[in-house]
Amino acid sequence: MLSILFDDPARTSSGALLIVGILLLRWALWPAPSSHWPLVNGKRWFEITTTKSKDRFVANGKDILLSSFKRLSKGFRLGTDNGPMIILSPEYVDEFRSEDRLCPVKFQAELAHTHLPGFEILSDKHVPKSVFTDFILRKLTPAIDSTAPASVTRLREALESTWTNSSEWHQIDLHSSVQVLSHTTTSPIFVGPELSSSKAWEELTYRYVGNFPVVACSLRLWPKFSQRFVNMILPSCTSLRKDVNQARQMVNEVLQKRAASQAARISQGLEPEKFSDGLQWWQELSGPPCDPACLQLALIFSAVHSTVDLLSQTILNLAERPELVDELRQEIIAVRESQPWGKAAFYKLGLMDSVLKETQRLKPVSIATEDVTFSDGLVIPKGSLVMMSCHNMREDSVTYPNPLEFDGHRFRKMRESPTNGAMAHLVSSSQHHMGFGIGTHSCPGRFFIAAGLKLTLSQILLNYDLRLSDPSENVTQNQGLFLMPNFKAKVEVRRREPEIEL
């Protein structure tokens, strides 16, 4: 039929209209897998597309969510900027935590186009989840103690270049400077001395990590059937592909040079040179094949996006609270004078841990790989995008007295509780706080991220004073369901004389 319609130019227009008509009919009559769940923010009667409803979600997502749970306590469908999602009540967290059929990896693949060239760093094919998790748990986390001293030196140099040594109050670019600090603490550990000292590698990773989420979001605006074609012609997508290919060339060149050097040393009867970085650790792992360049970009992407938001918001919160900064400085000095930086020292930074956990606002998301039926009969259809609501983190006055008030001591005091003490740590997860995910869906890199955050924040607080240029300015902003740092808020800093050298 298609050949009859399109072989004759005179019929092309009517053929196109017929195809569009068939597609619209299918869209209208074929129910989505989760369509029996009530949609709380669909199109209004005079709206043809979902554009306006998505705009309303981005502007008022939090209010829509809270009002909807008052009517539909177990959950509902919410039209988001990423398409319709099932929003579950936190009451299902115990079943959610161990449900393998709710798969965050597939959700990630759905939103990040990981099947397309340029986006493959988050693909399970190029970076298998088992290899990624094994790398973090067996190599990265155990290296926290050994890598801390060098990270301190690099942080000091990065702060001097971005925040300067001026003892006068001056404004900083919070977002870009925190990105620099995040790269500073991770890049040498991930890729070793050859690439971490390369300006080309630094520029590539900054560019790629910054562009990836923006380009992925823009590609989602196109119909799914057209995305593979659009990916090949959109300049921003082309740029991502070029960066991935360049990363492969650079990583492979380092690996080849190391292999040649090691072979030469062995032939001369010398001990092979020992490397302690991600490029070496990757080669020591067993498991399915893994693209080493994609692994490196995935590590950097995950670390930067996990760190920048939380560290930026913490700095904004502390800039409003000089008395809390003084308490944190006293804690840092007491801990550092008693022992060197490492996991044991970071554990003792209880107040800092509490401040970071109080600041944290992240959410776990998944996709159902099969129909999932919970114990009360609630069904999640296969193919549904699912989000576990964390609104109780800000609304639960039983667990969190005065829940809307920032209390830097909240989780430090909770540590002393015989019933809730175990869930009070930054890296802990529970029904009441899912900042790093929950159960089998928890972030495997949370211990490494927490250590890096505490090391960076210690360096900042001992060496700089903080304040907001305009104390009346909001330090957070809502975007859809998420509470984001307000990067338009102007932060000022000045160099101070540290009580001790870290």
Curated annotation (Swiss-Prot):
UniProt keyword annotation of Oxidoreductase present: yes
Pathway(s) this gene product operates in, as recorded in its UniProt entry: Secondary metabolite biosynthesis; terpenoid biosynthesis
One GO location term (cellular component): membrane
Membrane topology: Single-pass membrane protein
Swiss-Prot/TrEMBL GO biological process terms: mycotoxin biosynthetic process; terpenoid biosynthetic process
PANTHER family xref list: CYTOCHROME P450, CYTOCHROME P450 MONOOXYGENASE AUSG-RELATED
Name this protein carries in UniProt: Cytochrome P450 monooxygenase prhN
Originating species: Penicillium brasilianum
Organism taxonomic ancestry: Eukaryota, Fungi, Dikarya, Ascomycota, Pezizomycotina
Underlying gene: prhN
